[in-house]
């Protein structure tokens, strides 16, 4: 009512999982039959916030701790080296959060002349701000997870990394 919608259909996520169980559950359904159940539509993104200046072309990066990318010294070093290597070739925009509501703590990423750190604020608009920035990026590089999957949905080429594959649904591979 509050949104002025009088009639609607509710699609519970369990319906999607049921329809595609043969693909990611028992693995008895191939890719082509699974695709017959899906219709992809563009993801609407808000504009970049007023006052936020971005390079004309850039690679968006988002590195954070999760089960598949634990906060270990060798991964921190590798991540820093990766961001620095990208920044030698093209501007980098580091997507960061100002608040942590789960276990996804940002990896420390280097400062540098071609590295732009953007903290998405206010925190309630974190995903909207990151989505707006990501939509403008030439590519995404970062931790395998929700932001990498968002890049795919936005049509942005991703390179997403994981150290060890566990604590993830088969559907997320």
Describe the residue ranges of each PLM region:
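A nucleotide-sugar donor-handling region in carbohydrate enzymes
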Residues: 2-64
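Hydrophobic/aromatic beta-strand patches that form the interior of the parallel beta-sheet core
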Residues: 93, 141, 157-161
């Amino acid at each position: 009512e509050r949104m002025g919608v009088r009639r609607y259909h509710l699609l519970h996520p369990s319906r999607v999982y049921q329809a595609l169980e043969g693909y990611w559950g028992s693995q008895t359904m191939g890719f082509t039959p699974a695709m017959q159940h899906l219709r992809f539509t563009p993801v609407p993104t808000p504009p970049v916030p007023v006052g936020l200046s971005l390079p004309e072309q850039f690679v968006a990066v988002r590195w954070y701790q999760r089960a598949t990318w634990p906060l270990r010294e060798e991964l921190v070093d590798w991540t820093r080296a990766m961001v620095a290597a990208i920044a030698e070739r093209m501007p980098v925009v580091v997507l960061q959060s100002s608040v942590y509501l789960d276990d996804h703590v940002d990896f420390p990423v280097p400062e540098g002349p071609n590295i732009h750190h953007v903290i998405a604020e206010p925190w309630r608009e974190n995903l909207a701000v990151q989505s707006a920035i990501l939509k403008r990026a030439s590519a995404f590089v970062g931790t395998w997870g929700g932001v990498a999957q968002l890049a795919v949905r936005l049509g942005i080429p991703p390179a997403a990394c994981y150290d060890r594959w566990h604590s993830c649904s088969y559907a997320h591979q």
